[in-house]
A protein has these predicted regions:
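Short, strongly hydrophobic alpha-helical membrane anchors
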Residues: 1-12
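N-terminal start-of-chain detector that recognizes signal peptides
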Residues: 6-7, 17, 41, 111
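N-terminal signal-anchor transmembrane alpha helix
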Residues: 14-30
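Membrane-embedded catalytic cores of phosphoryl/pyrophosphoryl-handling enzymes
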Residues: 25, 42-156
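Membrane-interface helix-loop junction between the first two transmembrane segments
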Residues: 29-46
Length: 156
């Protein structure tokens, strides 16, 4: 198969990718507003950052799962694969990545306490990496809802 710019441009006509992109943008915007409500300050980097409420990883993965279900069928192998990968992504967000964030908090405290006189790092370890199970569930619901709303309403 010959790859060309014309074939590559079809990516921008892929309904699943467009819906996933819209879901990502919306979810990150929600995350930004929730951060403002809870912290009483704007931090535009939260729009691009990982971690926090709701989980964009969960929203994006479940959005893709549902749009694949609509497009390919709920009994398709592609749907089953997407669902399995989505569960892995969500388990990782609430498990390994969350633990990494908790460990980063401890390391930052240790470095601050024991190395007051001597700077050993230019910046702290990122602490807001993973998600609570609730953040993962909320993100998953947002992804499902967005897929259901957008799949039937985007026509191209």
């Amino acid at each position: 198969m010959k790859i060309s710019i014309i074939n590559f441009s079809l990516i921008f006509k892929n309904k699943i990718i467009i819906i996933a992109l819209i879901t990502w943008i919306l979810n990150q915007a929600i995350k930004l507003f929730i951060f403002y409500i809870t912290e009483k300050k704007w931090d535009m980097m939260r729009f691009f950052g990982a971690g926090g409420m709701p989980s964009t990883h969960s929203a994006l993965s479940m959005c893709v799962v549902v749009t694949i279900g609509f497009a390919e069928g709920w009994d398709s192998s592609l749907f089953a694969l997407a669902l399995a990968i989505s569960f892995i992504v969500m388990a990782d967000a609430a498990g390994v990545r969350r633990e990494t964030g908790e460990q980063a908090k401890v390391l930052n405290k240790i470095i601050l306490e024991f190395f007051k006189e001597r700077k050993i790092r230019d910046k702290n370890f990122e602490e807001l990496i993973g998600h609570t199970p609730f953040e993962v569930i909320v993100g998953a619901f947002i992804g499902i809802i967005m897929a259901c709303i957008l799949y039937g309403n985007l026509n191209f």
